[in-house]
Amino acid sequence: MLPADNGYYFLCSGHIYFWNGDVTKQAVPLCSRPNCSHTTEDCAAMIRDASQKMYKVDDGFYVLSIWPREDSKTGEKMMPIWRVQNDGSGKEIVGEIPDASVVNYTVFQDKIYYTMEDIRTDGNYQFSVWQMSLDGKEKKQIWQGDLYSGYISTLQGIGEWLYVSESGCEEAIDWTNEDNIDFEKLPTRTNLYLYQPQSEEWITNPDEYKKEDVLLSIQNIYQNEIYLTYYDSKAEIRKVWKKGFDLEDEAQFVGEFPRKAYKWDNLYGYTWPDRNDEDENWFEIYDYDGNLVQKIDLYPHDDIDIISADEKYAFVYWIQAQDGVGQEVIGVIERDKIATHEAELIQLTKGMNGNSFER
């Protein structure tokens, strides 16, 4: 979710949208072509199989498509990175990265960073991080992971540092004996790496982040503070800490939550489906003291995720069935309606069916 002077830009269902901040209006695809149906690839707003992340640099948006294209010279499958003009007048491919089953990417300090999944002959895989220029002409490997068969949960620029969080096994797994592997007893760990592009300095597991055993993720960034989620497997609870952007800033404990918690002004919220009643799904909002402020009914939607929040809105993502096909949807919850218990989920996008965007 990218704020602008006159509204917000966001990526949903393979399209870039603009929303002017009026809850009585829907978001519209970022395309200035007259009479465009926004359903074909010549639409400026449409990026086929777009990843869920979008970045703005100068007058353009950078979006990775995970739909691979075959290189006419080498035959190698490559995933294109598109640059879309911020007025919706056009788009172009500025770079490509090799096709991979799992990929993370980000744009930070005028460089593109992405992960590569390196498959070994013994069936294990490891991750590496690569840096690419914005025009796609220069690229180099800057990091090689030392864990096996895991995942990268964070690749994100924050302040002056690029954050890389990797989880995996400390030793190669014998996949030839897979039926007898006790996965719970494998020596696994999570490492946090910080990279400073100017000095090309790497820091591994800085002390400021060693607050709990397992760092799940950098949950969200809110007003120059980083919210970190750790998991206590014994208590089956998530513990949240916060710290400033400066590396030396001491982290402070926020609280314990049963599910992913999202910082929102002076409140915290998380989705909470009722597992005893499949017809119930809620977004619960609490104050600093743990008091319930409002419980917003999200049914019939499920698998809802809060993707961003500012002083006015929380932006919500979910999958909605339409004509037998799952459609990605974005909605908002108004911050100022919570005090009066009038907040509700407002849908901003519809499916890509012909004229569904007409007013």
PLM feature segments, named:
Residues 1-4, 40-57, 99-109, 147-159, ...:
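Repeated scaffold domains used in trafficking and secretory/extracellular systems
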Residues 4, 12-13, 23, 57-58, ...:
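Short loop/turn segments that connect beta-strands within the blades of beta-propeller domains
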Residues 10-11, 62-65, 113-116, 163-166, ...:
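Residue position within the beta-strands of beta-propeller blades
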Residues 15-42, 70-97, 120-145, 173-211, ...:
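Surface-exposed loop/turn elements that mediate protein-protein interactions on large endomembrane-trafficking
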Residues 49, 53, 68-69, 166-171, ...:
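Intrinsically disordered, low-complexity prosegments and terminal tails associated
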Residues 113, 141-158, 163, 167-168:
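Extracytoplasmic/periplasmic C-terminal soluble domains
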Residues 215-220, 226-232, 237-238:
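N-terminal leader/targeting helix
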